[in-house]
Amino acid sequence: MKKRILAGILCGAVVLSLVGCGSKDKESTSALGTSATQAAASDTTADNSASDAASDTTATETAAPVADYSDDENINQYSAFAVRSESLHDGHWDDENSNAGSNKSLSPDLSWDPVEGASCYVVYMVDVSANYFLHWKQDNITEPKVAEGFSDRRHYVGPYPPKGSTHNYVVYVIALKNPVEKIQGSLRDGCPQIGDFIKALDTDKDGNTGNILGAGKISGLFKDNV
């Protein structure tokens, strides 16, 4: 009888031990599953953060530069827009744009974003190294771009500084609500009053003021090595 009781006690102990082990295994498995889930969530969060950071960097790198002409009294009172040119390389105008030697004297390529409300644009180019010598005056441009060679010799003459010297040539693009009667300035002449010529564009051909909607600018150097 005692042996049977002892055997029963031993069997009960074994069963309890097995139940306890199973419970611990379940707890361990549950703990491992929880840890794996947390790790996966952490990795996903890290991946999302990295993706967001990459997007922010890309947006910053591809954002268009903001035009700032606050240091140019000729146009700093107008809304600014950026001007681009494929005729500029390393800050210098191409030889094809020059009138030096046998160069072609082609007016430069220009482009800019459309200005809201503008029906036309005016372009001026001056040599700021030589008393604002006027190289380009073109009106009635109806698209936000001009191809290289757009202007003929009545409206454009390319840079031709003294041999061996480097001059700085500034192009102004003025956005107008309406056309004007006439743009001022004489080609191949010094125009230190270029600011006044630009201000005159603020009155359209019918005498209405407030005609200038914005102004853009781009500049480049040219050195005569011919």
Annotate each PLM feature.
Residues 17-20:
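C-terminal motif of bacterial Sec signal peptides marking the signal peptidase cleavage site
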Residues 22-39, 47, 54-226:
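N-terminus-centered regions that define maturation/targeting leaders and the start
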Residues 1-4:
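Positively charged n-region of N-terminal signal peptides that target proteins for export
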